[in-house]
């Protein structure tokens, strides 16, 4: 996306959040707190990990506080800290600026605005489509289980809706979902996920070869 003339498309399976309005279960632009849903009468913990039946094994708060116990200042080596290390601007202390307070979950919307302009792929696609659409047309292929363990399908839904609305040119790509498939579903509707996720290259290389 940042080098549209140098790469011949993407084949993304279970992509990390590609629309930050659904950063797993958090909208980093509109939500105030990453750990709880707002409500008039109660606060409800945001789920962070589930199985294909929707059984929740961890909340966003629990996952983040585990990271905090492993290392402060984005140094745990775990998933939320990894995203923060990539997306965030450098703070005055030399470490990535937190997208939210690890202890309370309060979101820093100034950091969110930086993420949006630099790493929110769905937003950048829409923003730059008039300039780069001809390079991106027909080259975007996204596959995701509709029961992704980390709710990554939520961002794919939003990105798909945006892509379908593009014109001049139309995006002419592929977005496909695996029914009840968990993390790392890659587009194969014929085999169980635990098999197909091990042969991803055998699936996407023939499709890629058609483009080149």
Predicted regions and their residues:
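Non-catalytic cap/lid and distal C-terminal segments of serine-dependent acyl enzymes
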Residues: 1-212
């Amino acid at each position: 996306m940042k080098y549209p003339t140098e790469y011949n498309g993407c084949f993304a399976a279970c992509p990390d959040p590609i629309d930050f309005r659904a950063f797993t279960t958090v909208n980093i632009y509109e939500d105030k707190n990453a750990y709880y849903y707002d409500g008039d009468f109660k606060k409800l913990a945001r789920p962070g990990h589930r199985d294909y039946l929707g059984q929740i094994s961890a909340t966003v708060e629990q996952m983040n506080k585990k990271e905090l116990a492993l290392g402060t200042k984005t140094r745990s080596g775990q998933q939320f800290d990894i995203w923060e290390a990539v997306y965030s601007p450098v703070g005055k202390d030399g470490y990535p600026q937190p997208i939210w307070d690890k202890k309370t979950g309060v979101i820093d919307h100034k950091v969110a605005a930086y993420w949006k302009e630099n790493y929110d792929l769905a937003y950048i696609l829409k923003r730059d489509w008039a300039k780069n659409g001809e390079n991106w047309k027909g080259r975007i292929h996204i596959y995701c289980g509709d029961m992704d363990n980390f709710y990554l399908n939520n961002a794919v839904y939003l990105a798909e809706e945006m892509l379908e609305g593009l014109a001049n040119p139309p995006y002419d790509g592929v977005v496909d979902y695996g029914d009840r498939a968990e993390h790392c579903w890659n587009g194969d509707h014929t085999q169980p996920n635990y098999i197909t996720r091990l042969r991803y290259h055998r699936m996407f290389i023939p499709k890629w070869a058609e483009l080149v």
